[in-house]
Amino acid sequence: METSILKTAVKNFLGNSPDWYKLAIIIFLIINPLIFFFINPFVTGWLLVIEFIFTLAMALKCYPLQPGGLLAIEAVIIGMTSPQQVGHEIANNLEVVLLLIFMVAGIYFMKQLLLFAFTKLLLSIKSKRMLALAFCLASAFLSAFLDALTVIAVVISVSLGFYSIYNNFITDQNDVINAKHDNHIDTAKKKQTLEQFRAFLRSLMMHAGVGTALGGVMTMVGEPQNLIIAKNVNWDFVTFFIRMAPITLPVFICGLLVCFLVEHFKLFGYGTELPERVRQVLEDYDKKTSAKRTHKEKAQLIAQALIGIWLIVALAFHLAEVGLIGLSVIILTTSFCGITEEHALGKAFEEALPFTALLTVFFSIVAVIVDQQLFTPFIQFVLQVSETSQLSLFYLFNGLLSSVSDNVFVGTVYINEARTAMQEGLISHKQFEYLAVAINTGTNLPSVATPNGQAAFLFLLTSTLSPLIRLSYGRMVIMALPYTIVMTLVGLLCVEFLLIPVTDMMVHWGLIALP
């Protein structure tokens, strides 16, 4: 009896995850305290970061909340950080938490409008290259005014809608979320078409994801860390855009060029066309829904469009915290679309809350990074070199650390360290402003390398869409690789050779004023 209970308990641990994965997590939990107490806390800190990245990489084997959460709880228990520091990190990032809870749910209630708009876009543009550019451009434009997580939530919602339409057509299975295996598909031809459609959606999702980085780096509201950096150097919306332009505009152009080339030459998993059969299904669906659209549904679309305008205006002018704007979207859409039942409201939060919990665990890891001073050696090294080398090194170290850590945290740490150096007289105010540009671009551009570098990518990886279209951590890294290389190198070259002369030119033209 006791043996069977023990076996069941072992089997219950991390559920249906592979045995080797369960064993790896147990080994991590055993060795971390030993290394912390008997070898070196600093080494343990970096080991914990690597282990957490491992749980993210294996997201399709087991949702990272459980294994990552166990590692974080143990880190607090053994003294790598404190509950107070974890609470402090969560408080510092409350805006992001509110964004996830309310904004993503708000977008859920605008799904009807978004599916309508993106279906028209998808069906009206026949060329895959042009469609990829359209998705990338749309994501970049929206991310300049909205948060990247909001934009990626929109695109996930739309892609899930496309997938649902075709999945329901080829099967009798209406619950697309549970249709993660292909056993319900009766012919090889249908399976082949579905695989092609998955590849098509994967490429669109990655183009859209990179688009959020290309647009998000440009403005002070594009990413949470942008706002923090802008406040430190006292830049307004227009000044921030102009000061970033010597790096962001060339990177944006090169990013769009990469988008076109990988589609044209079918590289890194891109280039798959929309299957003609799927296009036909989507066109038929669009015609049927248009023909059957009632006055009530038309009124709902108009209401959602007006609320969408409110959303963009409110975010662009930062009329309130992003999460509170999201809450207003929930209230307005549900009020004017007639959604008043509690269970209907609850569905909107199903997508975001697991990721919100995961991000909170991530803040626990960030608390360890702070308490164990894991980034201190990098910062001290950079501040010791000459001013001309500081810009490139700040950019590179920000990019490297943002690829393995939260880019909000990295940007905040580096801008605070740069400000402290200025206050202590180690660097001039002019150099501080140049460093702010290097820090902002460094945290936003190279961090597309891995899903844990960009919160939007991590949200995509852990969404219900990823297993449906077979978008794993490894595949995301590979598909992001051409963008990572080009955006990082072009950004570095612009920081090294264009930032100072172009800024001086803009000062001469009277566009900006240097201290």
From Swiss-Prot:
This is Na(+)/H(+) antiporter NhaB. Na(+)/H(+) antiporter that extrudes sodium in exchange for external protons. It is a multi-pass membrane protein. GO terms for cellular component: plasma membrane. It catalyses: 2 Na(+)(in) + 3 H(+)(out) = 2 Na(+)(out) + 3 H(+)(in). Belongs to the NhaB Na(+)/H(+) (TC 2.A.34) antiporter family. NCBIfam families: NhaB, PRK09547.1. GO terms for molecular function: sodium:proton antiporter activity. Keywords: Antiport, Cell inner membrane, Cell membrane, Ion transport, Membrane, Sodium, Sodium transport, Transmembrane, Transmembrane helix, Transport.
